[in-house]
Amino acid sequence: MRTPKPVVLTILDGWGLNEDTSSNAPVLANTPTMDRLFATCPNATLTTFGPNVGLPTGQMGNSEVGHTNIGAGRIVAMDLGQIDLAIEDGSFFRNAAMLDFAATVKAAGGVAHLMCVVSDGGVHGHILHGQAAVKLMVSHGLKVVVHAITDGRDVAPQSAEDFVAALVASLPQGASIGTVIGRYYAMDRDNRWERVEKAYDAMVLGKGEHARDAVSAVAQSYANKVTDEFILPTVIDGYEGFKAGDGLFCLNFRADRAREILLAIGADDFDGFAREKPVLSALLGMVEYSTRHSDFMTTAYPKRDIVNTLGAWVAKQGLTQFRLAETEKYPHVTFFLNGGKEEPEVGEDRFMPKSPKVATYDLQPEMSAAEVTEKFVEVIGKGYDLIVTNYANPDMVGHTGDLQAAIKACEAVDRGLGAVVAALEKVGGAMLVIADHGNCETMVDPVTGGPHTAHTTNPVPVILFGGPEGAKVHDGILADVAPTLLQLMNVPLPPEMTGKSLIDL
């Protein structure tokens, strides 16, 4: 088999397949390149949710899970399932790091602050984890304050009232809610420090909007026509901020959107905005957020090493690779694709155009796709063996719930893909086009009729362009992508990769 060069993986983040075309942005968009690829290239579908990507049954996938499985070439048991099981079997309540945190805060005479996503979306956090952690801390004689991060992005846009009410009803004596904060502020990942500062002020200083109780905080937000994701950081009556000796436990099990607020709270060298660092007795994370965070935090569930990822294995063969995505998805094609390893592999180059500085991406659905494409076309001619690129638009604009904007997002990506195909035709390269999960193919909630902003469990495409003559592709899972790329590169699989190539010759 001829070895094409480069071999390319293009990830259309959030571009799923849905037979219902009524709110299906990829179908409603003008996408001549994707239409051509579907019509002329071998294609099939991939499953991106549940046990096929290491998640509980029925749990939708997400970009972290997707890129981790893609890079690993095997099904990777994800943190959500691990933590759920620990709560179920009771080992959660015996977790050494959590017990150390509780003992340290108690010895300092402090309060245990718990930062928790209050939804059952299961992408960054889960309300059940928060309820379990409250139970654990109260059982050790600690006063507990919950900082409720409202979602509205991985669940319905106006579901926080029910989730917050359920959390309040479950709180034992000694536990209360101190703040209610939309994830737009508490979980930024694009260095928009003006947002993070508002969340910091509410949590740490007790400054912000005010409400008499947590449910009222959500209700008054709705009265102002502000949905869950965007709830202004709101301080509940009686909460006065962090005090010396207090401790913070962040329950996010996905790293990217927890990093900024935690740097503001815990890093000595933080310079995102002027602040006086709180004097905490303990700072605990559900998982490891980065090596920098590990300098000032402990971890309840340390990461497990994923040996011989796609990037590591390509590097071991003495081959070169390039990773490309705008800011919003850059960690996914680097950190997550490399199995949680931040440093590039030998022979791995990277480029990250900045995502546009807009409040929400429906205001600029093209995002930075043009810059991504310009660099993409350039590096196709540079002699790399493997190129991995992520187009963020379908997912990031899909999360806004704006169908017309999502259509524009798909069209912007399709234009870029057209230039990429032309560049590959010139050099004789091959490409797999896939998505890591669905999103923008369902922009209206079929139950409520309102905007649908979450990921889906729909199948996603896999298309082979420039592959071997007569090749076909079959349905599979994300763990099969790396073995497929390695087959195209004529590189043997490492023994750890249990995925199977999607190509039938």
From Swiss-Prot:
Binding-site positions, substrate: H124, R153, D154, R183, R189, R254, A255, D256, R257, K329
Family matches, as InterPro entries: Alkaline_phosphatase_core_sf (IPR017850), BPG-indep_PGM_N (IPR011258), Metalloenzyme (IPR006124), PGAM_B_sf (IPR036646), Pgm_bpd_ind (IPR005995)
Catalytic activity: (2R)-2-phosphoglycerate = (2R)-3-phosphoglycerate
EC primary class: isomerase
Keywords (A to Z) from UniProt: Glycolysis, Isomerase, Manganese, Metal-binding
Cofactor: Mn(2+)
GO cellular component terms attached to this protein's record: cytosol
Positions annotated to bind Mn(2+) 2: D13, S63, D436, H437
Residues the entry annotates as binding Mn(2+) 1: D395, H399, H455
Family classification: Belongs to the BPG-independent phosphoglycerate mutase family.
Subunit: Monomer.
Function: Catalyzes the interconversion of 2-phosphoglycerate and 3-phosphoglycerate.
Protein name: 2,3-bisphosphoglycerate-independent phosphoglycerate mutase
UniProt source species: Agrobacterium fabrum (strain C58 / ATCC 33970) (Agrobacterium tumefaciens (strain C58))
